């Protein structure tokens, strides 16, 4: 049993009450008057007592006989049920209970995911990455409704569409209404992500759910020393080459030039997962690919990164060692919400930069740019 920590027990004119505070005032949640038995049981719950221990408390208080213990057991169950119904006791919440349907599994790079949620989302976005059941790195659970408790913590990021909070052991994501998502809780080690969506019988927000899960993915991959770079990619001579630049620079256009001129397969139109394995850098396929629709579940050794700049003429410029590190760091979308997370990104950038070719390419949209 877990208590909603936004309630305190206080005595009003000699009568014990449970009083809500914080966000529960705004929701609003009612104050609850306790009788003697309720106050005793509340104190036991605060001590972490089990149902059997709570029953023993009452039996000792009232010197109950064996026959009376049966009636007291019903009282304890009714009391616990009432606290759960009011959101004061978080005993059997959807988050802790999970979903009864068998999970589906998918693999992205070296990581395996257990998924319970809308089948349409899995079929549309993860089926190409499906795998057999095995030990998983992240459990993904999508539920309809509100969480039993409201997490609190320091605000890390706030925009019109999204607020990210640090609630201690988890990151909490609060989305704008158009997403069709109430919130998402992701453990800091990335091992579990629970997304609470609004009722959506027509699955109009399936794509929003998919994009929201990317945040949970980024948390896990960073913990596993894998990082995501905003870039398009193509395959050339058995290696993945990335084209990176700010939105609208022409990443997809430049990759398409290589495809048209040299028949290089396109790997992803927007994002690439990078890691270093046995001192060799790799690019791993991702299902997230922007609006391009171009993605692959395969992974390849990483050949290099081209940092794109629009220009009137085509020109290649070499980069100094510090510029290589900075360019990689600035194109990452892996979390940098805290100093520690930023340093993780920096350390990877420093490790990756000397292992690959990279340059700045000033270019036009003409075939000569490739």
Q: For each of these PLM feature ranges, what is it?
A:
Residues 249-251:
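Conserved glycine(s) of the Walker
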Residues 254:
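Hydrophobic positions on the alpha1 helix immediately C-terminal to the Walker A/P-loop
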